[in-house]
């Protein structure tokens, strides 16, 4: 959805149509909630009631908040995080890897990582803006939107701003399929970047 939204905004959209789509989406929210699986409903309830430990998924978020909070400004040091090393924090190598960064490298480490991601997204947007053809620009914007969604979703759920999902943090989370997909999409960006200038033979 985020990829489609990014491409549509870049290609241009009638805001009257956009307004109607948003209104229909808001009206349809109750129906969407009733149609999703029970575990997904519990994740939404857990997000709305983070203090309720009886809701599955809240334990993960609580341990994530403890890990980030205990890291302080500079962190406990690499491989010295108690929540991580003693396995209090579930799925710490993929979904909640940002909490590990917060615990072991502190606020400074988290800010540095977010800064790197921000520059990464900025460079991709520059490539999209400088593309010589509309197709290449839309491809670059679509890939940028995908990376932006993954980054915001993963960090957001780690700090209790967004309901928990299984979205990984690009290039940081453990997982072959995640890294392979990210590298393939980055390849698309590099291909668009290569074609910004005319090649002379």
Please place each PLM-identified region on the residue numbering:
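Interfacial helix-loop-helix linkers and transmembrane-helix boundary segments
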Residues: 14-19, 127-135, 200
